[in-house]
């Protein structure tokens, strides 16, 4: 049963430490060549888990590239493919660093991997220009329990994808999902400030599940599925990234460069489309500076800058969302 919009200022927040993922995620490899059955599972359970389907050479290249960045930061020894932590603290806030630029795109656009994504989406796929890279040491600060779709209004028919590039056993802090809870709407509490934390009492405790992830596995998470990263209690980095795929023929989220703006419009040079002018209003979801912070419509002209690289989601000539691009 769907929940109504949650507006409970006094509710106790759900903390990642409260999540006990006792369930086991199911492999969907046997459904990969049956589009209808695969989509039914996705809509019913809120995820698709595919084991070992990405080309192993492409996964190893992406792993080595991410670990090379981690080595620059002193988190691992250069050339160590296992990602064993050196003990140096992470500076944090590196999820969308330009140091990782291109790694996810090269992996997902590998022809063998594109064939997998086409089966997942049901048509040729391209990436939504939003990628977050994770090289998380043990005992890193935990994120929140959240639903991706709540923060991405207007993006239609896309599928979030999470990929681990090194073995990620339960003690390394892989992803946990609230299975089947995608059918109940959004749980985020609009009665509290951003990031609108989910109340502790709305997700059944028995719905949480996880698994041991291996390189080449692909986890597709429904935009409405509550999920979180679990604590890393190992001696290694969690090396993973999350992206999103959408229709290549009809993408709803496009990368664009800001050319000019007024208090109520923005003109951008959009990839594969060209120059377009969109209206902005108080309901536009504006995150052009920090992807985790919604900015005020009233201050639009004060924080916008020509040359900004954005993800643009539009409905006709109206901007539904402007977000800082992280093209991967």
For the regions a protein language model found, what residue spans apply to each?
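Non-heme Fe(II)-dependent double-stranded beta-helix
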Residues: 2-44, 51-145, 151-152
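Conserved "cap/hinge" positions at secondary-structure junctions
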Residues: 52, 223, 245, 314-315
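Short, conserved beta-strand element in jelly-roll/cupin
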Residues: 153-170, 212, 220, 244-247
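Short, flexible, surface-exposed loop segments at domain boundaries
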Residues: 251-277, 290-328
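Double-stranded beta-helix
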Residues: 170-228
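Non-heme Fe(II)/2-oxoglutarate
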Residues: 2-28, 72-79, 191, 218-220, ...
């Amino acid at each position: 049963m769907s929940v109504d919009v949650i507006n409970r200022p006094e509710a106790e927040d759900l903390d990642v430490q409260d999540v006990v993922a006792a369930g086991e995620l199911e492999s969907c490899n046997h459904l990969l060549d049956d589009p209808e059955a695969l989509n039914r599972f996705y809509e019913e359970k809120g995820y698709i888990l595919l084991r070992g389907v990405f080309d192993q050479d492409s996964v190893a290249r992406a792993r080595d590239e991410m670990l090379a960045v981690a080595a620059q930061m002193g988190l691992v020894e250069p050339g160590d493919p296992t990602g064993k932590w050196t003990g140096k603290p992470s500076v944090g806030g590196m999820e969308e660093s330009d140091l990782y630029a291109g790694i996810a795109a090269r992996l997902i656009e590998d022809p063998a991997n594109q064939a997998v994504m086409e089966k997942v989406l049901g048509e040729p796929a391209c990436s939504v220009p939003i990628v977050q890279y994770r090289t998380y040491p043990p005992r890193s600060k935990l994120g929140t329990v959240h639903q991706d779709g709540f923060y991405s209004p207007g993006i239609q028919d896309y599928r979030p994808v999470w990929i681990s590039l090194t073995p990620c056993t339960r003690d390394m802090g892989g992803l946990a999902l609230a299975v089947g809870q995608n059918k109940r709407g959004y749980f985020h509490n609009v009665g509290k400030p951003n990031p609108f934390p989910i109340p502790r009492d709305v997700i059944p405790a028995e719905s949480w599940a996880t698994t041991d992830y291996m390189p080449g596995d692909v986890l597709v998470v429904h935009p409405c599925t509550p999920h979180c990263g679990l604590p890393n209690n190992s001696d290694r980095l969690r090396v993973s990234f999350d992206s999103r795929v959408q229709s290549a023929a009809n993408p709803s989220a496009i990368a664009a460069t800001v050319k000019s703006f007024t208090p109520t419009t923005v003109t951008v040079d959009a990839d594969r489309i060209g120059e377009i002018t969109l209206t902005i209003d108080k309901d536009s979801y504006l995150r052009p500076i920090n992807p985790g912070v919604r900015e005020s419509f009233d201050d639009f002209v004060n924080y916008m800058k020509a040359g900004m690289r954005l993800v643009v989601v539009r409905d006709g000539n109206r901007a539904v969302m402007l977000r800082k691009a992280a093209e991967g």
